[in-house]
């Protein structure tokens, strides 16, 4: 239950804080990248995180920033619980021009994709990655959960 609440709070926080918006066919959109495993060893946990993020988006599908309303669009990429596949999933999020990234379930894939997000200037928020190396020395990767001892 605490994990779901943390996911919801993270998603709503991102939806409310980020004003890096794109225009798509006249409508104003904020794209949020969801960098989670939906297959592989951590697929079950990643799917739960995706469900929490999708639920938050269904509850709060738009956000108002400075009096203007923006639609929140989720760009979900499966990093397949693999450090090899994580980089290509991260590159796809960069190519899709997301404003921020949420994820990943599994610290190894977060570490593997970190440089891709850093080079693109995209902030990432680790929802459940607990390895201190995910955020150590990074000005672009943040976390909302505890650290492994």
Feature names for model-found ranges:
Residues 43-47, 87, 114, 137:
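Short, solvent-exposed loop/turn and secondary-structure capping segments
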């Amino acid at each position: 239950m605490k994990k779901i609440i943390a996911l919801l709070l993270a998603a709503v926080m991102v939806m409310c804080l980020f004003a890096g918006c794109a225009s798509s066919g006249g409508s104003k959109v904020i794209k949020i990248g969801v960098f989670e495993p939906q297959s592989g060893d951590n697929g079950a946990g990643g799917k739960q995180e995706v469900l929490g993020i999708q639920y938050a988006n269904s509850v709060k599908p738009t956000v108002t920033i400075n009096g203007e309303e923006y639609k929140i669009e989720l760009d979900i990429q499966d990093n397949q619980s693999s450090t090899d596949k994580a980089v290509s999933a991260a590159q796809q999020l960069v190519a899709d021009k997301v404003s921020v990234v949420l994820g990943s379930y599994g610290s190894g894939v977060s570490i593997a994709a970190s440089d891709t997000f850093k080079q693109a200037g995209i902030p990432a928020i680790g929802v459940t990655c607990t390895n201190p190396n995910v955020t150590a020395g990074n000005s672009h990767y943040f976390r909302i959960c505890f650290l492994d001892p």
